[in-house]
Amino acid sequence: NSEGADTFTFTIAIPSDEVLAEITGRTYDATKKMYIESERVTKYFAVGYILGEKGEGEDERYVWRYKGTFNIPDETSATENDGTDTNNMSLEYTGIYTDHIFTNGAGTGKAGSAKAAFIRESSDIATAEQWFSEVSTPDTTFD
């Protein structure tokens, strides 16, 4: 497939050093309580999220991206003050097609790999709890 990777940016609260090392393929030495910018180990993750704002009149989409890596993030920092500044991190996720061939990856009854899938809340196919209880794929069915 000649289609390229998809890149998405998530703005998140700054994770623990252990989690940051895990998702970026770096090292966290628990004995020394030290994050180490070691050589990266490529690790793939599925990521699920809700797109759209219910209160904004948008039809929320429940999304799963099946295979991707997190890039080393940009961090924002503020000097110490008495204000209410928040510090977040922009984490870039690059999604690619799965190696796995889903039975319904190219539609019902058509095998294929997939990068992602989503359903709209209004479709009544599944609740958010059902959709996110495990990674929902083109082969997932809901009761």
Which residues does each PLM region occupy?
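Oligomerization/assembly interface segments of phage tail-like spikes and tubes
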Residues: 1-20, 85-98
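Alpha-helical context
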Residues: 4, 25-30, 41, 69
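Beta-strand elements of well-folded, non-transmembrane domains
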Residues: 12-16, 51-55, 69-72, 95-99
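Charged, amphipathic alpha-helical segments
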Residues: 15-38
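Short, solvent-exposed secondary-structure capping/transition elements
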Residues: 18-23, 54-60, 102
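Short, low-complexity, polar/charged sequence segments that are solvent-exposed and flexible
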Residues: 28-32, 66-71, 82-85
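Short helix-loop boundary/capping segments
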Residues: 38-78
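Mixed-charge, glycine-accented linear interaction segment located at domain edges/termini
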Residues: 72-143
